[in-house]
């Protein structure tokens, strides 16, 4: 069994919990997920099964994520979401939709982002959340992420803590909790993430996702990599690549990759083209 499953993660489960559930349900140990979702969050969590786990990196490196987020103002927590200890509360009822629109302009294109302390980002090989749990002080490393789009969908003028609902399209590694915290800092009110729903992860859409209790739809790898560079192998080339050997291909002599090598309708290998030679890095036996 090899392929991908588009799952809808419910709130309250970790991404690892979902992987463990799938392993047990499908009776296989080869299962991995693409892109961690916080336990409190819900939404699209793609899962790879069997040999498809070796293809995860190719989707993760290019997949943009889309979210619907609700952020509440006037509340600051230790985790930057509603799961953590409340550190401060204040009246933020003076905020308007216009105030929110002004600060959203800070979150377009490539930005530097500080991840939450309650996260799996590692410093000296140790996740930040462990430093926090053990009461150790550590400086979270700033990371560059890309925000393709951020839109105000709704302003909820609740008193004393108003809220907003946002649509966000962003790159891998973006923490929506960090965006919530930074918006609160810019407005000098404090803010925290109240709810998060991931509606898209690369080619995986919320509308097509499977509930955990349903029969899973297994998506063949070939369906997801149609837009990646590819070469078609002859029978002779296939036999050579299958055993890890390189083959000559017709190119302009450029070095590039990753390239997906097909024999018939099946992905046989991924690798690089160096000069006019395709050199396989990973070889697959889908369907065998």
Swiss-Prot record:
Q: Name one GO molecular function term.
A: tRNA pseudouridine(55) synthase activity
Catalysis: reaction(s): uridine(55) in tRNA = pseudouridine(55) in tRNA
Question: Highest taxon of the source?
Answer: Bacteria
Q: Which UniProt keywords apply?
A: Isomerase, tRNA processing
Name the residues annotated as catalytic in the UniProt entry.
38
The EC number on file is 5.4.99.25
Name one process (GO BP) from the record.
Answer: mRNA pseudouridine synthesis
Q: Does the keyword tRNA processing apply?
A: yes
What is its EC class?
Answer: isomerase
The role this protein plays is:
Responsible for synthesis of pseudouridine from uracil-55 in the psi GC loop of transfer RNAs.
Q: Which family does it belong to?
A: Belongs to the pseudouridine synthase TruB family. Type 1 subfamily.
This chain belongs to the protein called: tRNA pseudouridine synthase B
| Organism field | Carboxydothermus hydrogenoformans (strain ATCC BAA-161 / DSM 6008 / Z-2901)
């Amino acid at each position: 069994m090899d392929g991908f499953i588009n799952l809808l993660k419910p709130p309250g489960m970790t991404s690892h919990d979902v992987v463990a559930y799938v392993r047990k349900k499908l009776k296989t140990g080869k299962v991995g997920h693409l892109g961690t979702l916080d336990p409190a969050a819900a939404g699209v969590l793609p899962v790879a099964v069997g040999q498809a786990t070796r293809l995860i990196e190719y989707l993760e490196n290019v997949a943009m994520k889309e979210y619907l987020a609700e952020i509440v103002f006037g509340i600051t927590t230790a985790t930057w979401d509603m799961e953590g200890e409340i550190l401060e509360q204040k009246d933020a009822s003076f905020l308007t939709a216009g105030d929110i629109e002004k600060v959203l302009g800070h979150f377009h294109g490539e930005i530097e982002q500080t991840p939450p302390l309650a996260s799996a980002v590692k410093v000296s090989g140790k996740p930040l959340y462990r430093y926090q749990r053990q009461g150790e002080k550590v400086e979270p490393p700033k990371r560059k992420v890309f925000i393709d789009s951020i839109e105000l969908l709704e302003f909820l003028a609740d008193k004393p803590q108003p809220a907003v609902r946002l649509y966000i399209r962003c790159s891998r590694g973006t923490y929506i909790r960090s965006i919530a915290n930074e918006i609160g800092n810019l407005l000098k009110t404090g803010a925290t993430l109240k709810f998060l729903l991931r509606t898209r992860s690369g080619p995986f859409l919320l509308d097509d996702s499977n509930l955990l209790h349903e029969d899973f739809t297994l998506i063949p790898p070939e369906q997801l990599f149609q837009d990646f560079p590819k070469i078609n192998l002859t029978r002779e080339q296939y036999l050579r690549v299958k055993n890890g050997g390189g083959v000559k291909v017709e190119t302009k002599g450029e070095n590039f990759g990753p390239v997906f090598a097909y024999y018939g309708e099946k992905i046989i290998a991924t690798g690089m083209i160096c000069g006019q030679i395709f050199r396989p890095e990973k070889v697959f036996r889908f369907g065998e």
